[in-house]
A protein has these predicted regions:
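N-terminal redox-cofactor-binding region of secreted/periplasmic oxidoreductases
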Residues: 1-207
Length: 207
């Protein structure tokens, strides 16, 4: 979804986007629907792990999205950039361009978030990120208890300082899931140089 949007933005390239699954599903549109998608073959590949001794020979579900937007259309919508130290470690191991400082501009460009500091958060990106609306005395009591145990309160865990406790940020806006299909494909679908073909399970491309 993201790549198709970016490649067709200039009008210089033509893109055919093939999706094995359907264009969308009713339950992908509303946040509460994610629990219905965990084992729904119409929108989920329903992969499972192989039995192992460590799991008492159980098969563990590995949900993967089978519709436009992929797994962003069925996941729990919690938005986490990743631990800054992990990116820095990758750079130290020789992966140039992967430090947190290097990837921060990309994170900022992709998101639209009203909170946090301007130097670390994006305001005009396609992906809508919001603070969770599910607040109340219980959540605050848990956070206060963590603080009493020495865990710092982290108002914006996507700022680069993730150690601590705080409320989650979500890819939800105005009561709707913000999947990559909604944020990247919907704005691009009317461009003359993109063709989106759903229900197209593909084994090989003959060029």
């Amino acid at each position: 979804s993201v790549l198709a949007n970016r490649l067709t933005a200039s009008g210089e390239h033509r893109v055919l986007l093939l999706e094995a699954g359907r264009p969308d599903h009713f339950w992908t549109k509303i946040p509460i629907g994610f629990s219905r998608m965990i084992d729904l073959p119409a929108a989920n590949w329903c992969y499972e792990s192989e039995p192992e001794d460590n799991t008492s020979q159980r098969r563990i579900p590995v949900p993967r999205g089978k519709l436009l937007g992929g797994s962003s259309a069925i996941n729990g919508m919690v938005f986490v950039r990743g631990q800054a130290q992990d990116f820095d470690t990758w750079a130290q191991l020789g992966n140039r361009g992967w430090s947190f400082k290097d990837v921060l501009p990309l994170f900022r460009n992709m998101e639209s978030y009203a909170g946090g500091e301007d130097d670390v958060r994006g305001r005009e990106g396609p992906l809508q990120v919001t603070d969770t609306l599910e607040r109340g005395p219980l959540y605050e009591a848990i956070i206060e208890a963590a603080e009493q145990a020495g865990i710092q309160r982290t108002p914006d865990y996507n700022s680069g300082a993730q150690d601590g406790i705080g409320m989650t940020q979500m890819t939800i806006s105005k009561g709707r899931r913000m999947s990559t299909a909604r944020c990247y494909l919907d704005p691009a679908q009317d461009r003359h140089n993109i063709t989106i073909q759903a229900n197209a399970l593909t084994e090989a491309l003959l060029l």
